[in-house]
C-alpha cells in the first residue's frame, strides 16, 4: 500500500512541449482565450502570458466575433478547461455539418 501512496499521478496531457508557445484554450461556458503557456500542473491549471480573450456575439453565445480583449497574465483553473490546442497550424474552416444555403 505504501507503494501506491508514493506513486505520483501523471497528467493525461504532456504540455511541456508547449511551454513558451502560443496555445488556445476553450472553457466551460464557451469562453475562449489564447496566450503563451508559461506553466501548468497535473490538474491542468494553466498560466498564460499575453492572453487575448475572443469575445462572443451577444445575440448568439456560440459564435465568436472579431472583437478581442487583452487580459495579460492569467491563471486558468484546470476544472474549467475544456479544450487545449496549439495556435500554430490552426485555421478556421466552415462547419461541414451545417447545410450551406444557396443564394
Curated annotation (Swiss-Prot):
Disulfide bond entries: none
Function: Plays a role in pre-mRNA splicing as component of the U4/U6-U5 tri-snRNP complex that is involved in spliceosome assembly, and as component of the precatalytic spliceosome (spliceosome B complex). The heptameric LSM2-8 complex binds specifically to the 3'-terminal U-tract of U6 snRNA.
Database matches in SUPFAM superfamilies: Sm-like ribonucleoproteins
Gene expressing this chain: LSM7
Keywords, sorted A to Z: Acetylation, mRNA processing, mRNA splicing, Nucleus, Ribonucleoprotein, RNA-binding, Spliceosome
Pfam families reported for this sequence: LSM
The keyword Calcium appears for this protein: no
InterPro entries listed in its UniProt record: Lsm7, Lsm7/SmG-like, LSM_dom_sf, Sm, Sm_dom_euk/arc
Domain Sm positions: 10-90
Subunit and partners: Component of the precatalytic spliceosome (spliceosome B complex). Component of the U4/U6-U5 tri-snRNP complex, a building block of the precatalytic spliceosome (spliceosome B complex). The U4/U6-U5 tri-snRNP complex is composed of the U4, U6 and U5 snRNAs and at least PRPF3, PRPF4, PRPF6, PRPF8, PRPF31, SNRNP200, TXNL4A, SNRNP40, SNRPB, SNRPD1, SNRPD2, SNRPD3, SNRPE, SNRPF, SNRPG, DDX23, CD2BP2, PPIH, SNU13, EFTUD2, SART1 and USP39, plus LSM2, LSM3, LSM4, LSM5, LSM6, LSM7 and LSM8.
Protein name as catalogued: U6 snRNA-associated Sm-like protein LSm7
UniProt modified residues of type N-acetylalanine: 2
Location relative to the cell: Nucleus
Organism, scientific name: Homo sapiens (Human)
PROSITE patterns hit by this protein: SM
Gene3D superfamilies: 2.30.30.100
Amino acid at each position: 500500500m505504501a507503494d501506491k501512496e508514493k506513486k505520483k499521478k501523471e497528467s493525461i496531457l504532456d504540455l511541456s512541449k508547449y511551454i513558451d508557445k502560443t496555445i488556445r484554450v476553450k472553457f466551460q461556458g464557451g469562453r475562449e482565450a489564447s496566450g503563451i503557456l508559461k506553466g501548468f500542473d497535473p490538474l491542468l491549471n494553466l498560466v498564460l502570458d499575453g492572453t487575448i480573450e475572443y469575445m462572443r456575439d451577444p445575440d448568439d453565445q456560440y459564435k465568436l466575433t472579431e472583437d478581442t480583449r487583452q487580459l495579460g497574465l492569467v491563471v486558468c483553473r484546470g476544472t474549467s478547461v475544456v479544450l487545449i490546442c496549439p495556435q500554430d497550424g490552426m485555421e478556421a474552416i466552415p462547419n461541414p455539418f451545417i447545410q450551406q444555403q444557396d443564394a
